[in-house]
Amino acid sequence: MKFRILNTTLLFLVLSSCLASNIPNPFAADKNTVRVSIDLVNVDDDKVRVTVVPPELKVSSIAYQFPKIIPGTYAIADYGRYVEQIKAFDKKGAEMKIVRTDSNTVVIENAPKLGKISYLVNDTFDSEDGSGTFSEKGRTIFSPAGTNIDAGKQFTLNLAGFVGYFTGYLENPYQITITHPTDIYGTTALVDSDKEPQTDVFLLPRYPEVVDNPIMYASPDTAKFNVGGMEVLLGVYSRRGSVHASALRPDLERMMIAQKKFLGKINNTRKYAVLAYISTGTADDAQGIGALEHNSSTSAVFREPMKSKDLIHVISHEFFHTITPLKVHSKEIQYFDYNNPKMSQHLWFYEGVTEYFSNLFQVNQGLIDENRFYDLMAKKIENSREYTDKLSFTEMSSHILDPKMKRQYPNVYEKGALIAMCLDISIREYSQGEKGLLWLMGELSKRYGPSKPFDDKELIPVITELTNADVGEFLRKHVENGEPIDYDDYLAKVGLKKEIVPFPEPIVFVSQGVNYIKADSTNTHVLADVPDDANAFYKNLGIEDNDVFVEFNGLPIDASDLSSIIFLGYDLDENTPISIKVNRKGQDINLKGTVKLNYEDGDGYRFRDDTKRDLNQNWLKK
């Protein structure tokens, strides 16, 4: 795996004169190959030039399309709306007539004469409008599926935003040539078949592989290691230089060792790339925090101050996608229609099982203790109540692109994970602890596989066949029919009892519903608001009323954006070092110490039934 990028038409012409035996003339290559050139050197007004040479076309009329949606996103993207100045030229260089039938589609007559298509691509990061990906009217492309163009510095290439397909030619091979400045490199799971320092050439067997392989170009900030025969590449870009791959590598390596051990023979991934973009959170930068899974990589967006545990939480989820949907999936995913999609019924399976495993493996491998795992599940129960509990998950999944259904999507990470938990417990119970959900995934991967999808309607009957009637009844009642689940009942099977437990509050500036920060009268400074001494975080560091926040762990406070300081105080770890600079009565003061979190009591679970210890330990540890 190499981290470089490609060149454009000019380089093609130069190289063709010097290396004619290796670099064919643009119109004399393999007749079946779609050849794409992406120019990251000559960026025009924050736009990138793309040139596409078609395969041999034998139809009278051809459509060139950009995806309306891509796998794993569950929201309409319409990548074509970021493409402009589309032109078609015949093989002699004369411009041809085109008809743009919608934002994603260009139709060209006299297709056999087509020599190339050329267009400019805008990026998505600096146009995110705050409407959200999953709001009813939101049109923002989820940042990890988006694109970024920062000339000479950084490019995020989710290739669906740059490269389209010719209708009827999805299965044709692609040659993607990318020209880039020599001082930036591309992190990707792809192998560069070119040795030139300014050019990368990637060969892909079909269009779905193009969409499945993101590339991130930036000044080199990478780490590489091997886990159980799997090569892992981490690439990091931070505009402010606040995060580096070397700092994230130890925890990422520790986590991936644990994941490979947890999965055992089910996972046979040979190469895996992690592309981590660290957003400043400013209006012209990525807003959507999270990640998008691919077969051999993950594209992720984080926000400052980003910690290694943020990477672990996100990447642990995405890596488990190598099991589902990447290995076990329905025909709707295998034969994905990028412009007229039919969505699968089984988001609970693809996202819920994955999210559950990303939590379970941590207690299974000793990365967290049992009570911490119980608390994570309890929070999911609480969070799931923000959504419609009686909604059929199969109905929601198949209609997830309906604007009125979109707001239910985040529940796949809450109730979806809880469905997986209850399914795991049910399998453990009937098998007397010998089998669990991971065993079931192994059996399904044997029956199906990356190139052998299942029919949506057969998944639950097949799971019933592999397990027992009670498991099938659970899925029919709670997944298909949407009956609420009695979580207390299922957790009691493994010895847990509901009780009041203290939970850390997620933001140190808010406790018991009280805000402990405010803007001054001119909205130019962010101040501490200390109406009482109940905030343990403030009390421990000696923060006083009307202290002006200047820096938080070395990061400057953006007074124009109150949310930025709230984010700085989010999800901190108890007893970790912290430094806050405040201005108190005209004098800067550095307050140093350790994090003391605020806690709030809530419904949780603890192990209280010793007669269930064996089943409990088989559930958590086997």
Tell what function each PLM region has.
Residues I86, Q259, F349-F361:
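An active-site-proximal "capping" alpha-helix that borders the catalytic cofactor pocket
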Residues M1-T33:
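Bacterial Sec-dependent N-terminal signal peptides
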Residues V53, I76-Q85, F89-T269, Q287-I289:
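Non-catalytic architectural context of zinc metalloproteases
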Residues D221-H346:
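Juxtacatalytic substrate-recognition/specificity segment
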Residues T33-R35, K47-T51, S61-A63, L114-K116, ...:
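Intrinsic-disorder/low-complexity, polar/charged segments enriched in Ser/Thr/Lys/Arg/Asp/Glu/Gln
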Residues S358-N359, L367-K622:
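C-terminal recognition in membrane/secretory proteostasis and scaffolding
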Residues K307-I312, K342-Y350, K404-K415:
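Secondary-structure capping and boundary motifs in well-ordered enzyme cores
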Residues N25-I69, N158:
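Early extracytoplasmic/domain-onset interaction patches
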